[in-house]
Amino acid sequence: MATYLIGDLHGCYDEFQMLLERVRFDPAQDTLYLTGDLLARGDNSLACLRLVKSLGNAARTVLANHDLHFISTALGVKKIKPRDRVDAIFAAEDFFELVNWLRCQPLLIHNPAQNFVLVHAGISPDWDLTAAKVCANEVENVLRHGNYRYLVENMYAEQPDRWSPHLQGLDRLRYSINVLTRMRFCYLDHRLDFACKLSIKDAPKALAPWFALDNPLYQTGNIVFGHWASLVDETTPPNIYGLDTGCVWGNRLTMLRWEDKQYFTQSAVKKSNAF
């Protein structure tokens, strides 16, 4: 009985299957947590979606920026990006079922028994765990039950870029989405930066990785995230686990067994031609 956490799949189905086979993942006993971005630029996004969905309660994923973009294209709000390889999903007989399943996934998972929080991108430097859970839940409630099309139509903006407990309505939801699914760097005053996707050592000195800012949660809790492939091989604080190691870029897919903190990696079978 083991708990596994795995980085962004991006449609890298073969590597995903190889890792599951290597650890002898048993959905009757084990649990798999995924950092989101199940789809988009790899060769087999449809198979990734179907497999994670088929695992039922044995697999738990968080929503990520590419997942949300896919939902927006399914609604006709956004166009499919040239590098996204999702045509097979749109042609699938279970297309609507997959879209509805995906939009009902959480943005944050807290596992108090095993003392970790899972998000795609990060947690705001101005949030404690309670605020993070509340803000994630507010977005989830709209995507699952409310007028989610209205939110999807209006979630693409870079303002507000700083937290205030007085944020309301779309501004509050948009900030939460940006933090949980897009954030990498922040300015020292905690404003979000959306432009820099570099490694820490190559970033402008005015910016800091979100987890390097002053927030007690970053020191006391275990946070698992994906999203930031350029962090590969860089050192993060011991309780901050970045699992996106750029498989779709031709690097590797990474899985972590939580109980003993053992890592398993699978080199990319091939680099996606979507880049």
From Swiss-Prot:
It is an enzyme of class 3 (hydrolase). GO terms for molecular function: bis(5'-nucleosyl)-tetraphosphatase (symmetrical) activity. InterPro entries: ApaH, Calcineurin-like_PHP_ApaH, Metallo-depent_PP-like. It comes from the Bacteria. It catalyses: P(1),P(4)-bis(5'-adenosyl) tetraphosphate + H2O = 2 ADP + 2 H(+). Its EC number is 3.6.1.41. It holds the Pfam family Metallophos. Gene3D superfamilies: 3.60.21.10. Keywords: Hydrolase. CDD domains: MPP_ApaH. Belongs to the Ap4A hydrolase family. Hydrolyzes diadenosine 5',5'''-P1,P4-tetraphosphate to yield ADP. This is Bis(5'-nucleosyl)-tetraphosphatase, symmetrical. It comes from Aggregatibacter actinomycetemcomitans (Actinobacillus actinomycetemcomitans).
